[in-house]
Every structure is written in C-alpha cells, then in structure tokens.
C-alpha cells in the first residue's frame, strides 16, 4: 500500500543552518495497517509526513501509494488520496463555514474531485448519521459555524471529514497533542474506532507513550 525507499531530506544544504531531517529512510505499510512512529520533537516525524503529503519533494528516494509512484506528484493531487490531521485543531476546517458546509466540501472533493458540486438531501442525511457516531451532539448543530466548536470537537470533525470517503492513506500528525488529556483520549478512541471500521491504512506520529498504548491496546 505505502512503500517508501531510501528517502532523504536536508534543509538549508551547504549553509551553517544545514539540517539532515531524513536519511535513507525506508518504510512499508500493507493495506489496513495502523503503524505509529514514536519520537521526540525535532526527530523528523513531521518532515516525513510532509514528504508523503507532497508539501515538498525529497532530495533522494521514492514514495509509492497503492502501486502508484507519487514521488513527484503535486500536493493537491496527493490530497485526493491522502487524509491528514494536524496537531493544531484549527487546521483542516474552515471556521466561518458551517459544519454541514465543511463536510460537504470534504465529501464532494473526495468523491468527485469537485468541491463545487451540489449535495443532495441524501448526502445531508449521511452527514448527520456520521456526526451522530461521534457522540458529541454535532448532528443537531449542522448549521452552526465550525468556529464555535471546541478544539476536541473540531479535531473529531476533521477526522470525520478525512474519512467520509475512505482515503488510500490517513496521516495523523500528533493530532491530539494540543488537547486536554480527557478530550485527547476521546478523540483517540474515535480514531481507533473509525480506522478499524473503515479498514483505513493509517500512519500516526506521537511523542506520547501513553497515547501509543491507548491506540494499540
């Protein structure tokens, strides 16, 4: 499913600020795998995710996803195949748009490659059904702006948006690090449930051993 071979990335090469973030890294995930990478801040975890997502190109090595070489595929094309959650709950959603509009944008983009298509009543009912599974009452607030939600609610919504249409790969980049412990545990439980139910191939990074134990028990 995901195959990375000899990936290397150096920032500011040839200067006093040169930093080798990745060095000949190889990694393989089979379809349906849930793999967690544990490392301290600055260990290159987010650099790896940025390389996979296409935020920049690696200096050396190759990346393939579902049998397709994506090493030099533009970021916007990769985003149709790869879902991603960030540490900051404010990323991944549009605060001035409603919950329903955010879900529609994610759904139409993933399903049709066109975020400006129309959504049907059937689609709206599907959104409400999916929101209900989060157990946060968001199905009754679909007309509310996302900016009114708490950090935990926004992160749960982003998780749902990333998985409405099953992605080839889901990247979880310290996605509970900014949440309080109780909320983080709830979002992790939702993550584990959604990933297992939809059999999503998933790569998560964290520096928190407790969160690692929660997701893999």
Predicted segment positions?
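A short, flexible loop at the N-terminus of ABC-type nucleotide-binding domains that lies
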Residues: 1, 10-24, 74
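ABC ATPase NBD coupling module
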Residues: 15, 69-83, 91, 113-120
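The feature captures the beta-strand-to-loop junction immediately N-terminal to the Walker
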Residues: 38-40
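Helix-to-loop junction immediately C-terminal to a conserved catalytic motif
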Residues: 53
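Conserved ABC transporter NBD signature motif
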Residues: 61-69
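ABC ATPase C-loop
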Residues: 162-163
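H-loop/switch region of ABC-family ATPase nucleotide-binding domains
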Residues: 206-207
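Conserved small/polar residues in nucleotide/adenosyl-binding loops
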Residues: 216-217
């Amino acid at each position: 499913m995901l195959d990375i071979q000899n990936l290397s990335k150096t920032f500011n090469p040839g200067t006093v600020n040169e930093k080798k973030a990745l060095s000949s890294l190889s990694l393989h995930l089979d379809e349906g795998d849930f793999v967690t990478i544990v490392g301290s801040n600055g260990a290159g975890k987010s650099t790896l995710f940025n390389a996979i997502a296409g935020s920049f190109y690696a200096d050396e090595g190759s990346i393939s996803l579902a049998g397709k070489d994506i090493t030099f595929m533009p970021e916007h094309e990769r985003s149709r195949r790869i879902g991603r959650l960030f540490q900051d709950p404010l990323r991944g959603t549009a605060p001035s748009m409603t919950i329903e509009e955010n879900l529609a944008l994610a759904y139409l983009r993933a399903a049709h490659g066109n975020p400006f298509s129309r959504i049907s009543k059937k689609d709206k009912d599907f959104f409400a059904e999916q929101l209900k599974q989060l157990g946060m009452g968001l199905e009754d607030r679909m007309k509310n702006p996302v900016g009114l939600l708490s950090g935990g609610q926004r992160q749960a919504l982003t998780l749902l948006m990333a998985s409405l249409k099953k992605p080839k790969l889901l990247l979880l980049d310290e996605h509970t690090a900014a949440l309080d412990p109780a909320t983080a545990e709830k979002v992790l439980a939702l993550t584990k449930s959604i990933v297992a139910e939809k059999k999503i191939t998933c790569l998560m990074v964290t520096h928190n051993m407790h969160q690692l134990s929660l997701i893999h028990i």
